Amino acid sequence: MKVLDQSLLWMLLPFFHLIASAAEHEEVAKHAIKLHRGKGATATQRKQWALDSCRRLTGLLRQKNVVLNKLKNAIRAVEKDTSLSGEEKLFQVHTFEIFQKELNESENSIFQAIYGLQRALQGDYRDVVNMKESSKQRLEALREAAIKEETEYVELLAAEKHQVEALKNMQHQNKSLSMLDEILEDVRKAADRLEEEIEEHAFDDNKSVKGVNFEAVLRVEEEEASSKQNMTKREVEDGLGLSMLIDSQNNQYILTKPRDSTIPRADHHFIKDIVTIGMLSLPCGWLCTAIGLPTMFGYIICGVLLGPSGLNSIKSIVQVETLGEFGVFFTLFLVGLEFSPEKLRKVWRISLQGPCYMTLLMIAFGLWWGHLLRIRPTQSVFISTCLSLSSTPLVSRFLVGSARGDKEAGDIDYSTVLLGMLVMQDVQLGLFIAVMPTLIQAGAGASSSVVMEVLRILFLIGQILFSLAAVFLLCLVMKTYLIGPYYRKLHLESKGNKEILVLGVSAFTFLMLTVTELLDVSMELGCFLAGALVSSQGHMVTEEIMTYIEPIRDFLAIIFFASIGLHVFPTFVIYELTVLVFLTLSVVIMKFVLAVLVLSLILPRSSQYIKWIVSAGLAQVSEFSFVLGSRARRAGILSREVYLLILSVTTLSLLLAPVLWKAAITKCVPRPERRSSL
């Protein structure tokens, strides 16, 4: 320790002169400002000021070299000191190296500032591109400096912690410990080892990864009415890391994985959001029920009121949407549970041909209108494909209960045809997402690469078809050998313990979801197939599972429809009401007419009457256009204006869908069957 004290004294000696001459430096700074402003700027004074500044800088650099030499000598002395343990030697040497790094970084900062000033003086103030490039270089340098400073600060914290631990060990060695103190000391050491084992060092591991950018963020604490409560909460959140971060692009972040995994944490923003949605969904859904509208209207209105265009009280929008996706999963599982595989064999040709013909017709109309309006072909294809998709969760809510009464009928029923076509559209969605990167590149590609792009698209289509064949082959094997024994074992083990049955069915659904996702097919198709496989075990199994899963589905579906409302912007709709109403009605009417024409060609004569109901179910735009639109906007396919138009048209078509569905059911379905369909 004597060596350490002497070394630190030698390190601090050069800075005593700097402290003593602080007043003189302040005068020099004031004089430099005057010179910069042109006050008292005689030639002699400017020359003398430059000479003095260079002399002082040279002296500081000379002092820095002297200190570095003394640090090297101190490091050698520590390494030769036999009285120190190996760990203590490493700690002292590391402390000296931190100080060396600080001196070198300070010197580099001086020369970087001089270089930046020189580059700025040589540049043209009218050249915005050059100034932007200079600003970008300065920003990168500041980011790198911030990372280095952050790393040094963390190392100093570790050094401080080491000193505190060394002091504690010295105190414990000088006094006798009681039995309880010895136990606590052992626990402390074990806790230290545990923290070292579970710490991942994610910052250090990822800062050098390719594609990682350093950005400045703001840390925002929750405001409290009382300043005392605010300080208390801030101290707690500083320790728990539950505050919000905001980057320069106004993206907001919440902690996902803490450094210390031994302390339990909860995202209070997310909890408040779910509680608020649950409380406001009740009056909104109740009001819609009272006036004869579907409850999903109320849930969407709830999202509008709480979203960015309303009270803006939802902070964890991404987390709410993610939880809402589970509502889609369980909704499609129940749809598959009500779906009859035997009836699927009757309509598989209709389910395959109908969506393909409709998508091709929509793309053809889109390219035609795009040619008339001089829109890029890639943009026309993308918009047409987005608008050709229909909402599977929404129509599934329409069909809940409708298939049960029709299962014993011999003719093709509208629910089976509609579900088959929607499942095929989900497959098309997965195919379109796979082809989307090629579509993005096609906008900037040369004519010589058209053949390669076509071959690439054909390869992707073949890959998707192979994945579909693998999925259906797996389903056939599961139905024959797995699902029966699995359910019987699950039912036997869950006697009087329904959570095991619920968990077993949910796990099977998630397994199918994961399999289809790994094979680049939509996760929604996996949930639907899971329900269809379980339904093959008979009517009693279907009723039992439906009784347990429906409450879970209902709650998560509320979150899903509320998350749709978060993307509804009433002010934008009001500003462009005439245009949006015209576009929405045009899209709905076009999809309805195209569906009627296609179904008239592929439906048997005995089932022609259901084409009106099926067309009404398909005459809206899928909520997945939100996802596709956001990807296309980031990729540069869509402009901001077109993206907002797609969002608004999609939302208005979803709001119009229940009215159109109710009108079609009232007009085309016999009275005894209406109650289960409405």
Curated annotation (Swiss-Prot):
Bilayer-spanning residue ranges: 286-306, 317-337, 350-370, 417-437, 457-477, 499-519, 555-575, 579-599, 609-629, 641-661
**Coiled-coil ranges per UniProt:** 124-204
Q: Where is the signal peptide?
A: 1-22
Chief location of this protein within or outside the cell: membrane
Task: Extract the GO molecular function terms from the UniProt entry.
Answer: potassium:proton antiporter activity
Could you tell me where this protein is found in the cell?
A: Membrane
Q: What protein family does this chain belong to?
A: Belongs to the monovalent cation:proton antiporter 2 (CPA2) transporter (TC 2.A.37) family.
The free-text function statement in the UniProt record for this protein reads:
Probable Na(+)/H(+) antiporter.
Q: What is this protein called?
A: Transmembrane and coiled-coil domain-containing protein 3
Source organism per UniProt: Mus musculus (Mouse)
